[in-house]
Design a protein with these regions (language model features):
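Short gly/ser/thr-rich secondary-structure transition/capping motifs
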Residues: 54-62, 145-148
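Structural recognition of the conserved hydrophobic beta-strand(s) that form the central parallel beta-sheet
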Residues: 73-77, 99
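Short acidic, glycine/serine/threonine-rich loops at helix termini
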Residues: 10-15, 63, 87, 110-112
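Conserved NTP phosphate-binding and transfer environment spanning the P-loop NTPase/kinase superfamily
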Residues: 81, 85-195
């Protein structure tokens, strides 16, 4: 289950110190509804799951139901999943937390590596363009907010993880190039995001 599908409607989203929507904040998630749905699923009930429409900025219900069997495992993904404030109603001893991060292993030369943040930005640009209706310029514009969100909402909780998984692949930038290059070329040269 993607926690992003529990985003509050965009108009109800919190704002940062600059007045911009703060999509990285925990209270951008409808935590109460998320917990109600997760408790119901773990109790074996049939639950209609939301789907967040990133283009409209609204949570929608489209008849996507889920019911867990006695032996099923519930997998939840999202930036706040290591934070127990997200899943306050779920017993800690029933959780196995995995911290997944893309830790790039590529070097430019013998002394300089490809920064992990660069690989994550390319991943995010491709994802946002394919699934969220966002341009590369939009993603780059939001990147500082995303990085602040990592510092506030991910890194402080990484020690809470029961396991760590590196999701980077040596060849992934080569694969992503065919998707990233066209959207990067669409960034206007005279825009702040071009530099």
């Amino acid at each position: 289950i993607a926690v992003d599908n529990y985003f509050v409607n965009r108009v109800d989203s919190p704002r940062d110190e600059n007045g911009n929507y703060d999509y990285e904040a925990l209270n951008c998630i409808d935590v109460k509804q998320f917990n109600e749905d997760m408790e119901a699923l773990l109790a074996g009930k049939r639950v209609e799951l939301p789907v967040y429409n990133f283009v409209k900025g609204e949570r929608e219900y489209k008849g996507d139901f889920l019911q867990l069997g006695a032996e099923d495992i519930l997998v939840i993904e999202g930036i706040h999943c290591l934070n127990d404030d997200l899943s306050y109603s779920l017993p800690r001893d029933k959780k196995f937390k995995i911290y997944i991060s893309a830790l790039t292993q590529l070097n430019i030369d013998d002394h300089n590596r490809v920064p992990t943040t660069d690989g994550r930005l390319v991943r995010r640009m491709v994802r946002d363009a394919r699934t969220r209706g966002a341009s590369a310029q939009d993603t780059i514009r939001m990147w500082d907010s995303v990085r602040r969100g990592e510092e506030r909402n991910i890194f402080p909780y990484q020690e809470e993880a029961d396991a760590m998984f590196n999701s980077a692949f040596l060849y992934e930038l080569s694969v992503l190039k065919q998707y990233a290059e066209p959207i990067l070329y669409s960034v206007p040269r005279d825009s702040a995001e071009y530099n």
